[in-house]
Amino acid sequence: ASSFQYFPGVPLFHSKDLIHWEQVGNCLTRPSQVSLQGASIWGGIYAPTIRYNDGTYYMITTNVTDKGNFIVHTTDLYGEWSEPVSVKQGGIDPSLYFEGGKCYLVSNPDNCIQLCEINPMTGEQLTESKRIWNGTGGRYPEAPHIYKKDNWYYLLIAEGGTEYGHKVTIARSRHIDGPYESNPANPILTHINMNAQGNPIQGVGHAEFVQASDGSWWVLCLAFRPQTGYHHLLGRETFLAPMRWDKNAWPVVNGDGTIALQMDVPTLPQQPLAKKSPRTDFKGEKLGPEWVHIRNNHPENYTLVSGKLRLKAAPVSLNDDKASPTFVGRRQQHTDFTATTSMQLQKASPADEAGLTVYMCESSHYDLYVKQLADEKQAVVLRYRLGELTHTQKEVIVPQGKIQLRVKGNNEFYSFEYATDGKNFRKLDKMNTRYV
């Protein structure tokens, strides 16, 4: 999945039945693999693609803040990935296709889909880039992938941008470098038409095909779920839908080219995962793969000691748009949730602060934190940053010692609470979800 300004980059998930998924690691775990300094929420890592060939996994992606398109590889999905090799062909959303000992790269430089042959181990471009399809006329043709079936090369792309006009289109050719014939029934997946106007899923696009072990075909795509009005809370999420792909035919997604929150289809034999505790006790030697930092972190500021996570304060705030603050966080996975932490300031100077934040980017975040005061007292503070506006919503003096901070979320509001005894939480205020 895209990881933008967050480090480690490119979270990697695994499933044996396409239903139960678990994160098994991240592809980019070392600063030498990815530089995110100066990356905004719109920067960093875009749209990775993973491919397997002859015993090796390849991941190709784009660092739009630094060196553009690059590849890393591994023979062990649970281990470390290689150092990156850059590729010459530009654009975003690169993808790889392997056939006959050759590796082909497709991406979208110059607002069209282009193809070239490369060496995936060195990144060297072996042939000139060739324009192979412009799409169907929608803006931003991107996210290309090539599949071969029944001696046809199928070229799958996204068009229309990533909001409500998003769509998936497809073309095919007898030759990998074209010419490609557009599907007369394009788009094969979209929610821009009247038949999906009231669908709770919108902005559907950027798709991949996968064939399961039983021969069934599935499509994975990105979309968002609007909450109130045009606001969507969890960003672009990954959806899975059934697909029929008959011999020599065009693929048909879920019967009518739309998807739903519930779709009744035969499934693979289910292999549920062991239930994990929602609690993180910090008793391991390192943080789990789900924890991330803003940009490349400073490891010396993070220590796991006796079941506690010790964070060293730094002179970089959450408002900084270039450097890395002392921050460790998790992506919000659910509309309704509760997040609680027990914390204590130690060796703090006046104005030092630490706490919980609901963070979208450096200019949009809600902060619930404990602040050290000059008279050896401390305060629990609720503050927000929205664009150019920073405001302290509420501040309460509390005794020195451990403080419990809690954020409760739903589709409309985040509620911010604190406790000094670990049991009796007091609500400071609630903030609207639409602004972050």
Where in this protein do the model-derived segments appear?
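Carbohydrate-active catalytic/glycan-binding domains of CAZyme proteins
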Residues: 1-436
